[in-house]
């Protein structure tokens, strides 16, 4: 079993080290992670400059780019053999609902999925690495179940969110759908030392759709949430509607 591990918090993040230690229990591990924190970079690839890859004292390789860069470079030139599984995390903070659109953690896993490799993104819901040991045990349980069941031979993408509590690995896992958040808080306007206005992106909105069956509901009740994701952004439910509209008004631009 060959496992590629990435993240978006950077190669020095405690969550990465914890996940790598777990993955080594299941196979040969390669680590390719960002040089710096790259949270919120989504699926961005660096196309305007070359990327550099260096090796840290602990053997982790790090890239001066995004999480997607890391997995892309690993799969298309850096690794001698294709991995059997790509895992990302453990992230410092939740990636639930709309977070998945912006998440570098999810994007790193998705990059593996786009190359045909099954992939899992792991996130610890509260920031600050509280109960990282429990989250690590939960991640171990997910990996053990996936690998023992032979599901790693299939093609899928899973988003796993782990509640920040000491018993995170003890309650039953829940398969969930993505919930939704309210709009983000307004930007925070400040003034630079030069007197120019500068802006910080506001905090993520609170949960808006968090009913039973959602990732928000699962973690709020102490359960590890596992959400199967897909990449197809087509609005299949409205294909017929838009096709009919275009026919009714002529098909030319």
Swiss-Prot record:
Binds 1 divalent metal cation per subunit. Signal peptide: none annotated. It holds the Pfam family SurE. GO terms for molecular function: 3'-nucleotidase activity; 5'-nucleotidase activity; exopolyphosphatase activity; metal ion binding; nucleotide binding. Its cofactor is a divalent metal cation. Its EC number is 3.1.3.5. GO terms for cellular component: cytoplasm. A divalent metal cation binds at residues 8-9, 39, 91. It is an enzyme of class 3 (hydrolase). It comes from the Bacteria. This is 5'-nucleotidase SurE. It comes from Leptothrix cholodnii (strain ATCC 51168 / LMG 8142 / SP-6). The gene is surE.
